[in-house]
Structures are given as structure tokens and as C-alpha cells.
Swiss-Prot record:
PANTHER family: PYRUVATE, PHOSPHATE DIKINASE REGULATORY PROTEIN 1, CHLOROPLASTIC. It comes from Shewanella piezotolerans (strain WP3 / JCM 13877). ADP binds at G150, V151, S152, R153, C154, G155, K156, T157. This is Putative phosphoenolpyruvate synthase regulatory protein. It comes from the Bacteria. It catalyses: [pyruvate, water dikinase] + ADP = [pyruvate, water dikinase]-phosphate + AMP + H(+); [pyruvate, water dikinase]-phosphate + phosphate + H(+) = [pyruvate, water dikinase] + diphosphate.
Length: 270
């Protein structure tokens, strides 16, 4: 039986999940996880406590409870359960209060809530990424913070959306297709924004596997076509002095981090 894990918060529970995943990923085990957001009342907290206690009775093992709860009275109810508590916020707040010489002023939903102009900036960045995905339009490239380039299925769209959602970066992306390969060059709209260009590449074998799952036994997915496209695009990156990273076997989080590290783009945290 898998060890039970609870991610609990009086907000979205995103912080608790991220913290918990980071810790649990250090162990080569699988877990049975349950996320419970918006535990904003004592009544809800008592219900969650009952779930945790029932789990302990059923399994005979104390559940792992990762939480980021602002309200002390709700936090105390979770503390009184049979779970093993890992309190992300309170672990660090008290030492910081001492160092900063002032008490914390807890507020619900401050971390991932709709509280200020930064929220609107994030929505604007997400809308921009969707409107400028896959070369749909070249009219607004001058408004981009970043323009990702690459062959089809190398990770441009998920990387653009992740950068916009997590960091408020206006990321457009442009694909190089089979039709471009005979005379591969940058379109004028990209040339005018060359300082914003960043390339993605991928191992041809992995690209072949991805394309096969989408359009099997086609020219588009053939090993020969994949090798040719990757080779031509990488040669163009080098010719035009466009920085690029290899996305093979990397998660979208890792790809985004590599891009940010290479470009020194400012992260807009929310």
C-alpha cells in the first residue's frame, strides 16, 4: 500500500504541493497524494482532520501532511491530527520575524491570489503567448520579451505557456516546417527582433518518437525527415548566432530554467 500524503492549504495549495513534491522527489517511492485547497474555516479543518485520522486508522501509518496555512486557528486543528506535519510557512516565518525585526502580517491568497497589478500582467502574458503561438501571427513580435524557435514538436508551445504562466514573460514562438528547409532563413519579422530570439532543438530519434505518436508512418514523422530538419535548423542557429538549448529528456520546467539562465530575462514572480 502506498504511503498517504496530504497537501493542505487555506489558499490554492500550490505552495504546499510544490514544497511537498520537492521533498518527496528525493525518495525512490510512489505516494498516494490528495490535495485539499481552500480550507478556510474551522469546520472544514475539522473535516480534513477526520480524513487524516481515518487514514491513520485504516493504514496503521501516519499520513504525511504538507501544509501552508495562514490562519493559526486552522493550522492548530491540522496540528492536532494523527498526521506527520510539515508546515512550510510557519517553519520559516518565525525565524524571519526575528531577523527582520517585525511581525508577519498573514493574508489569505497573497501568494497565488488576484491581489494586485502583477495578476493582470500574468494574464496579459498568457494571452500573448496563446495569440502568438506557432507563428499564428507575426504582427506583434515587437511586443515579445522572448521568441522561441524550432522544428515542429520540439517543445516550443509548452515552454512559451509555462514562461508566461509562471513568470509573466511574453513568449511568442515560431516553427520551422518542412517547406522552409530548402531555403531556411529568418523571416523579416524575426530579423527585426533578433535580440529576442532563442532556439530549441531536440535529438532526432526523440523527435521521431514524438511525431510517430501524432502522425505515424508519414513523411513528417520519418527518421530521415527528423534528422534533416534538426540538422538544418541547428546550422541556421549557428549561422545566425542564435543561442539554443536541447530539450531532449528535459521537463518543461527544466527547459524554462535553462532559457531564463541563458537569456537573463527578469522573472516576474507573483
Amino acid at each position: 500500500m502506498l504511503r498517504k500524503v496530504f497537501y493542505i492549504s487555506d489558499g490554492t495549495a500550490i505552495t504546499a504541493e510544490v514544497f511537498g513534491h520537492a521533498v518527496l522527489s528525493q525518495f525512490p517511492l510512489e505516494f498516494d497524494a490528495l490535495t485539499i485547497p481552500f480550507v478556510e474555516t474551522e469546520k472544514k479543518a475539522e473535516a480534513v482532520k477526520a480524513q487524516i485520522n481515518d487514514c491513520f486508522i485504516t493504514t496503521g501509518e501516519r499520513p504525511l501532511v504538507f501544509h501552508s496555512i495562514v490562519k493559526a486557528e486552522i493550522r492548530d486543528i491540522i496540528y492536532s491530527s494523527e498526521g506527520l506535519d510539515y508546515d512550510f510557512l510557519n517553519t520559516f516565518v518565525a525565524p524571519l520575524e526575528k531577523q527582520l525585526g517585525m511581525p508577519a502580517t498573514p493574508a489569505l491568497h497573497r501568494t497565488h491570489g488576484k491581489t494586485n497589478d502583477s495578476y493582470e500582467a500574468r494574464i496579459e502574458a498568457i494571452n500573448y503567448a496563446m495569440e502568438n503561438d506557432d507563428g499564428q501571427t507575426m504582427k506583434h513580435m515587437d511586443k515579445a520579451d522572448l521568441i522561441l524557435l524550432g522544428v515542429s514538436r520540439c517543445g516550443k508551445t509548452p515552454s512559451s505557456l509555462y514562461l508566461s504562466m509562471q513568470f509573466g514573460i511574453k513568449a511568442a514562438n515560431y516553427p520551422f516546417t518542412e517547406d522552409d528547409m530548402d531555403n531556411l532563413k529568418l523571416p523579416d519579422a524575426l530579423k527585426r527582433n533578433k535580440d529576442k530570439l532563442f532556439g530549441l532543438t531536440i535529438d532526432p530519434v526523440r523527435l521521431h518518437e514524438i511525431r510517430q505518436s501524432r502522425m505515424s508512418n508519414s513523411r513528417y514523422s520519418s527518421m530521415r525527415q527528423c534528422r534533416m530538419e534538426v540538422k538544418e535548423v541547428e546550422m541556421m542557429y549557428k549561422r545566425e548566432r542564435i543561442p539554443f538549448v536541447n530539450t531532449t529528456n528535459h521537463s518543461v520546467e527544466e527547459i524554462a530554467t535553462k532559457i531564463l539562465e541563458a537569456t537573463s530575462l527578469e522573472r516576474h514572480m507573483f
